[in-house]
Curated annotation (Swiss-Prot):
Gene3D superfamilies: Phosphoenolpyruvate-binding domains. It catalyses: 4-hydroxy-2-oxoheptanedioate = succinate semialdehyde + pyruvate. The gene is hpcH. Catalyzes the reversible retro-aldol cleavage of 4-hydroxy-2-ketoheptane-1,7-dioate (HKHD) to pyruvate and succinic semialdehyde. This is 4-hydroxy-2-oxo-heptane-1,7-dioate aldolase. Belongs to the HpcH/HpaI aldolase family. PANTHER family: 2-KETO-3-DEOXY-L-RHAMNONATE ALDOLASE (PTHR30502), PHOSPHOENOLPYRUVATE CARBOXYLASE FAMILY PROTEIN (PTHR30502:SF0). InterPro entries: Aldolase/citrate-lyase_domain, HKHD_aldolase_ent, HpaI, HpcH-HpaI_aldolase, Pyrv/PenolPyrv_kinase-like_dom, Pyrv_kinase-like_dom_sf. A divalent metal cation binds at residues 149, 175. Its EC number is 4.1.2.52.
Length: 263
């Protein structure tokens, strides 16, 4: 077993990614052929569940793009299910301290190294027990990325970086800016200073820094500072803004006057 994404991070090769929020396998496969190094299947803010994550993993599998899956929470039961359907790289949201980081790592490892439940006969990840010595190989193939998204997490960054089994730390600019008092403005100078300092600190500790940033200039700036996995766009945004721009070129205007609510 191997994890190409994990190996690329360990080798210091920057990985450029795209966020997937459309929650379906058809668009996931379409984007898997676009040339991105990694694709984030979002279970926190997109309408995904274990079944939809599975179908997207299957759709992406024939392509070079590597899947990264974000569960909705640092929950060992949910993590176990995602690993069993074939996720190897997880992005764990809202990790605040070293204990929570250790819990995330433990959830991805079989005993005695962790607490992952054994159900390989039912698991796509083990090819239904067709992979010899799966239990020993699986632990080494796991890639654990944790998100720091608050001032508390930033203050605990050094201890989070000391946790064995953490491969990378992802800075969440939207939640971080909100927690710092600048909701909706991740480009505020104070937020940017915090992000840049964190990238340098993470890389200096021998871990991979990551972030989502659709602003091209800032994304390149983060790469220059040492970020190793950078998502540079979101599928829903690409579709929405692209469709609006096309309509506008033909004189159409966005009209939401008939909308009575989000439902």
């Amino acid at each position: 077993m191997k994890n190409a994404f994990k190996n690329a991070l360990k080798a210091g090769r920057p990985q450029i990614g795209l966020w997937l929020g459309l929650a379906n396998s058809y668009s996931a496969e379409l984007l898997a052929g676009a040339g991105f190094d990694w694709l984030l299947i979002d279970g926190e803010h997109a309408p995904n569940n274990v079944q939809t994550v599975l179908t997207q993993l299957q759709a992406i599998a024939p392509y070079p793009s590597q899947p990264v899956v974000r569960p909705s929470w640092n929950d060992p039961v949910q993590i176990k299910q995602l690993l069993d359907v074939g996720a190897q790289t997880l992005l764990i949201p809202m990790v605040q301290n070293a204990d929570e980081a250790r819990n995330a790592v433990a959830a991805t490892r079989y005993p005695p190294a962790g607490i992952r439940g054994v159900g390989s006969a039912l698991a796509r990840a083990s090819r239904w027990n067709r992979i010899p010595d799966y239990f020993h190989q699986a632990n080494d193939a796991m890639c654990v990325l944790v998100q720091i998204e608050t001032r508390e997490a930033m203050s605990n960054l050094a201890s989070i970086l000391d946790v064995d089994g953490i491969d990378g730390v992802f800075i969440g600019p939207a939640d971080l800016s909100a927690d710092m008092g600048f909701a909706g403005n991740p480009q505020h100078p104070e937020v940017q200073a915090a992000i840049e300092n964190a990238i340098v600190q993470i890389r200096a500790a021998g871990k991979a820094p990551g972030i989502l940033m659709a602003n091209e200039a800032l994304a390149k700036r983060y790469l220059e500072l040492g970020a190793l996995f950078v998502a540079v766009g979101v599928d829903t945004t690409l579709l929405a803004r692209g469709a609006e721009a096309l309509a506008a070129r033909f004189g159409a205007e966005k009209n939401l006057s008939g909308a009575s609510g989000v439902y």
